[in-house]
Amino acid sequence: MAQCLADKRPIIYMRFASHEPLVKPQPGVTIYELNPHKGFEAFTIEVRELITKEGREACYVFDCLSELQAAWSADLMMGNFFRVTCPYLFELDTVAYFPIIRGGHSFQTIAKIRDTTQVLIDVYSSPENDLYVHPLKMWNRYSETMFLAHRYSPQTKEVFTLTDGMEASKFYALAGEEAQAAPDRNTDSWDRFFAAAQSDFRQGTLTANTCTKMCNMMITKDPKMREMVKRYFEPTDYFEVRNHMVGTGIIGGKACGMLLARKMIQLQQPGVYKHLEPHDSFYLGSDVFYSYLVANDLWTIRIKQRSEEGFIDEAPALKEGLLNGSFPDDIRERFMRILDYYGQAPIIVRSSSFLEDGFGNAFAGKYDSVFCANMGSLEERLDAFESAVRRVYASTMNPSALEYRRRNGLDRKEEQMALLVMRVSGSHYGHRLFMPTAAGVGYSHSTYRWSDSLDPSAGMLRLVAGLGTKAVDRTQSDYPRIIGLDKPLAQTNQTWADKHRYSQHNADVLDLEKRTITECNVLDLADLFPRFAQQAVFEHDREAEGRLRERGQFRPVLFASCQGLAENREFTTLMANMLSTLERCYEHPVDIEYTVNVGKDNEFVVNLLQCRPLHLLQSGKRIDLPKLLQEDTYFSIKQCAMGKSRVTPIDVVVVVDPFHYYQCPHIEKPTAARLIGMVNEHFRNTGKNCLLLVPGRIGTSSPELGVPVAFADVSNLMGICEVASSEAGYSPELSYGSHLFQDLVEADIYYGALLEDRSHVYYNPHFVERFIDITAEVLPSTVTPSAGMASVATPSAAMASTATPSATQQSAKASSQFGKSASYEKTTTLVQVFDTSSSSLTLWHDLRTNTSICGLQKNLRE
């Protein structure tokens, strides 16, 4: 320091520890007070920003790095901090001093520090107040006595090389005594803490403070979740998690929710708990994610992506890096132990980030989960497992996840990805298929009331045959079974034809031969299912079978409706009790994911896979619905909408023309999704309320069934209406329980379905023709096919009510052409945008009666 001051080089003191200050305030010294308890990422980025600010050739003094171990609970993250900070200091031609307590850290951590630093020196103090200095690494320096121990005399301020045998023996005796007194340095401080906690538990001296520390450092950072974990967890629960953990850090929201829910059921409903499958999950701690970033030199781009300007723009590059990184040998060894444990049982690698499944933010479907068939040699299984981990890590850069974080004010919050590794619940069918009998999602409180007689507080199940992906994704022509738990047999479809049509036609299964998820016709599973599983999942179409018998044909006509499970009162009662218990324990509505496997005599087991607080629609005050003239009504619907009660003026109406969308070639149908995304971005932060009308299902993965938007494409809209068109085969689905619906709820986006042949539905598609068409102002004149989109030409002038017939009118005239071979015109009005801000167009929705009206009322806004 004296030399730096003499050279007039700035001295920067990074102050973050509880020990006495190493540098006193004085001219030429800048002191920064830092808080490592904000977390590794926030702390590390703050330090880097300060280093950038101070510039080149500065001198730095850091507090003792060992204090970071206490703040972050593990040596690993302290080592990671040094590995990303030291090279940056070197890059700026600085001099930096980092003290660390010898003997308090694992050999592995010190080895990483030694590999990174340019100079490493051991310092010892003797009882005689002599100081011994032992250089361990001197980069680009060498002398014959450099790496011998040296003695420094505080009295004479002289340094002597220990070449004398007597002097050297004193030093080695001192070093040996310290080594014997140090803790086991073959283990991390994390492991030493848990070993001590288990020892205290066996001796009956474990304290509540130690349990709290285990919760805080390993289970969750969510304050509400922490309180519940401490209320329900026993010490052995913490130890069990640690024994199944790879690395250090937090296990994340999804893992925490699953464990907590199972513990609540175990303690509060032992009868229900007997029907739960035991779990033997593993957890990849959140620190492994950061270590992966550091080990693959991705930290710099991570910092760029964390910035406001790079949050979206830098994501693709970081995602690419995450997909192509490699894991340290010690982590790969732990991965192999997991695979050895599971043998050849299929497993799934699930995201379990800091922010997932907590109060206020569900992150439903934002991050990936990857199934592993777990077949082949150990090397093949390890490659597949590592690939799955990389994919989930990379999904943190998914556009929908980033948009969700930005919309909910989470873009500046620390987000680490932990992982939950679970055995896939199910049975083998034939030689290659694996799946549960059924799976789905459940809600302790349902706002989807297709009948006034249903009790929302009784809860609801969304149930499919096979893997549960069909229950949470909007796919092709599949309709999950909806079960209101107060009236399990109540259905929206009354005729056999409707029951058959609006049922599940395809199932997701794990193909062990192809080692991937595959979709198959659900009827192909009927012959593979044992009789008791058939009875649980499949239902006979008695009407169709009767017609066949009249023709002399005797064969069953089946469709998948999970009717047998709906009729199983023990199952529906158990699920109702489970959901109500979890809601009571959470003191908040919840939703769950689960599987069901059935056996003989109506026996069954349920695997509780996930539980999280449910973002519930609030009814608010009762809305007085206006009585509008028919010519002033755009649409009115009952029992076909979702969203909180509201009276909202509408500034913009966006319409996807059903005829042109139908005629659009399959490969170019994503045009509509792209254009909707452009409209969504155009009106971001403008304060304008935009209402979107689309044919069929919004957000489906099958473009022929609807527009395949992601949530990021509609995140700024006020409302969305799905429009039925039987001629084109477009049919809305009120997908309560899908990930997209959860996004709409959290974003407070209204959803309505304009169904056909319903007495309580009125819809006038020509209504928007009276408004000004502003498509040309909002959308580009063309969207080129080279980007995977069809060309789209917009009108050259605003359209009034007396202008050329709109796309809506053209659709009406051309309705007879649906299903016929009609050429698709590349230049067409696929999406139209109408300015309604100067009118009194308003949406009224009353959640209590589930009634919506959209239309004009004079002077509404005055």
Which residues make up each language-model segment?
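Phosphate-binding/switch region of NTP-binding enzymes
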Residues: 101-155
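Conserved P-loop NTPase "ATPase switch" module shared by AAA+ and STAND
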Residues: 54-74
